[in-house]
């Protein structure tokens, strides 16, 4: 029985890795071994940063809400507590959007939170 070296399958596998490494600098897009290492590392970075992105956006929203809340004489934590007491359930993404694009609506929410905190 003749020896099978798996030429077609191996070549396809290597071509797939080199295609994924397109745009990498230097030998990282030319040499299979180096390209494979970089593709694996890139996959790890992508996996990690898809989760990191969620944390980064939440931090950005909180920063924007805090800045707008302080313009109304409240801290972020007191604003959120006041909104919870008044039964207003608006998520941080929407609050941050209001703080940037519709400050009057945000000010109304802040006033409602203040009213609950002063009770």
From Swiss-Prot:
It comes from the Bacteria. The keyword Transit peptide does not apply. GO terms for molecular function: rRNA binding; structural constituent of ribosome. The keyword 4Fe-4S does not apply. One of its GO terms (cellular component) is ribosome. Keywords: Ribonucleoprotein, Ribosomal protein, RNA-binding, rRNA-binding. Pfam families: Ribosomal_L20. One of its GO terms (biological process) is translation. PROSITE patterns: RIBOSOMAL_L20. Binds directly to 23S ribosomal RNA and is necessary for the in vitro assembly process of the 50S ribosomal subunit. It is not involved in the protein synthesizing functions of that subunit. Belongs to the bacterial ribosomal protein bL20 family. This is Large ribosomal subunit protein bL20. It comes from Bacillus velezensis (strain DSM 23117 / BGSC 10A6 / LMG 26770 / FZB42). The gene is rplT.
């Amino acid at each position: 029985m003749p020896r099978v070296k798996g030429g077609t399958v191996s070549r396809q596998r290597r071509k797939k890795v080199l295609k994924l490494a397109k745009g990498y600098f230097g030998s990282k897009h030319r040499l299979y071994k180096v390209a494979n290492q970089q593709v694996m590392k890139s996959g790890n970075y992508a996996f990690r940063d898809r989760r990191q992105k969620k944390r980064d956006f939440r931090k950005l929203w909180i920063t924007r809400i805090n800045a707008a809340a302080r313009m109304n004489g409240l801290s972020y934590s007191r604003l959120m507590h006041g909104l919870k007491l008044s039964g207003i359930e608006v998520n941080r993404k929407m609050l941050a959007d209001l703080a940037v694009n519709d400050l009057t609506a945000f000010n109304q929410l802040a006033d409602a939170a203040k009213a609950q905190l002063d009770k």
